[in-house]
A protein has these predicted regions:
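His/acidic/aromatic-lined binding-pocket segments of jelly-roll/cupin-type domains
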Residues: 67-69, 232
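Conserved beta-strand->loop/alpha-helix structural units within folded catalytic cores of enzymes
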Residues: 28-34, 73, 105-110, 174-188, ...
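Acidic/polar hotspots within intrinsically disordered regions
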Residues: 2-3
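Active-site helix-to-loop segments that bind/position phosphate- or nucleotide-bearing substrates
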Residues: 102
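Alpha-helical transmembrane segments in multi-pass integral membrane proteins
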Residues: 9-25, 35, 39-62, 77-94, ...
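Short, conserved phosphate/pyrophosphate- and ester-handling motifs at nucleotide-, phospho-/glycolipid
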Residues: 30, 67, 176, 309, ...
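Hydrophobic alpha-helical transmembrane segments of multipass membrane transporters and ion channels
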Residues: 107-111, 115, 178, 315-319
Length: 403
């Protein structure tokens, strides 16, 4: 595609982007969920005298906030790409969707994976320079050549490993990609067949949660089922969108009461460590009752800084674990003391870690996440348009903040 034709196409592309109003409450809720995951992983730094797991299950059950991400994702994808429209999408439009999704998650995943690999290479060289065994690059079953290739292909949570590998949080991106491919398949089939596919997905979700209940296991207990776990929560999000009219007639006061009751119930269910399916159901209810950006909870969520945390949530999520690992290694190398050596010291360390994660995430969002997303979107879409020149048709790709 020559430059003139490319810029002509780009102008049309921007004009015909499907405009969807951002669900600001959902953006803010993503930020809350990301911070909860950070606290879940940082709680291991606390001194035993202030171990939160001694008096509450709230952080122990924090893995459920990842399921919350999947529910939000399913709802937003159904909303942005108009899943209830019976007409099937063309393969070309579906490819545009996949390009947008890959551009959304893969660049930061690749950058953080490379950073993780470089860190372990650096540690190996330092150990070698000190006359110690050069370890830590391909050190165990969590970090080997096979898992590295799987991470590069973003398929490492598709049932081939027993646990997380390399940059641990990236497992959810792999599971998310699995959901994106399922959603792409839904877009390419028409209304009746799409309904049948959704019924099949719903049955799969029911079977997964019934298996968890029957075996008295947590949803994260069998890592090889991570893709099914993600698809189950993602399907809940789609179904919530299809049933969203259930709250449209509620007054703002009624909606506020439901929002407050759902939040209190969710807090209590996490605190007492009840069955995961109940907490997931309450999370789903919160997603549903906030999608219209009405009610007191939405007013609280729609503040500048809380919304900003939502925008930075992906970078927060992707960098916090590597920062945690590096900081722990450096602290213990320089001081010779474990992080948990004192209650006050451990609290200050956790506060410092959170204070470090946020600015790094802001920088990452502005200088890595957004630029690479735009670059890949333009380049891959340009290649697609060069191969399949359009007689203009609507391309359903959300604007930057809605993705």
């Amino acid at each position: 595609m020559n430059d003139g034709r490319f810029h002509h196409w780009k102008a049309h592309f921007m004009i015909h982007i499907l405009n969807k109003k951002e669900i600001r409450s959902h953006t803010s809720l993503r930020g809350w969920a990301a911070l909860m995951v950070v606290f879940v992983h940082f709680r291991s730094f606390f001194h035993s005298s202030i171990d939160p797991d001694e008096f509450t299950f709230f952080l122990y059950k924090g893995y459920l906030w990842v399921d919350f991400f999947f529910i939000l994702s399913g709802f937003v994808m159904a909303y942005v790409y108009d899943i209830e429209h019976p007409k099937r999408h063309s393969m070309r439009d579906t490819m545009h969707y996949l390009i947008a999704r890959i551009a959304r998650i893969y660049p930061l995943h690749l950058i953080s994976l490379v950073a993780t690999l470089l860190f372990f290479i650096m540690v190996a060289f330092i150990n070698w320079g000190l006359g110690e065994e050069a370890c830590c690059v391909f050190d165990d079953s969590l970090r080997n050549a096979e898992s590295l290739v799987a991470n590069l292909l973003l398929i490492h949570a598709w049932g081939m490993f027993d646990w997380v590998t390399w940059n641990f949080p990236s497992w959810s991106l792999s599971a998310e990609l699995f959901c994106y491919l399922i959603f792409a398949a839904l877009l390419t089939i028409d209304g009746d067949n799409r309904k049948l596919a959704l019924v099949a997905l719903s049955c799969t979700a029911v079977l997964f949660y019934c298996l968890c209940i029957a075996t008295s296991s947590d949803v994260d207990e069998n890592f090889r089922l991570s893709a099914i776990r993600a698809a189950s929560a993602f399907t809940i999000g789609i179904l919530l969108f299809l049933g969203r009219s259930a709250i449209s007639t509620l007054s703002e006061r009624s909606l506020t009461c439901i929002q407050i009751a759902a939040c209190i119930a969710l807090f209590l269910s996490l605190h007492f460590g009840v069955a995961d399916i109940l907490s997931i159901g309450l999370m789903a209810l919160i997603v549903l009752v906030t999608w219209e950006d009405r009610g007191y909870l939405c007013t609280c969520l729609d503040t500048r800084y809380i919304h900003a945390i939502g925008l930075f949530s992906f970078s927060i999520y992707m960098w916090h674990y590597l920062i945690k690992f590096i900081a722990k290694q450096d602290w213990e190398s320089f001081t010779g003391l474990p992080v948990q050596s004192s209650a006050v010291g451990s609290m200050l360390f956790v506060a410092g870690m959170i204070g470090l994660v946020i600015p790094i995430a802001v920088w990452s969002y502005r200088h890595l996440e957004i630029p690479t997303r735009k670059w890949i979107n333009l380049r891959l879409t340009g290649l697609l348009e060069a191969k399949y020149p359009p007689n203009w048709q609507l391309i359903m790709v959300p604007s930057e903040r809605k993705r």
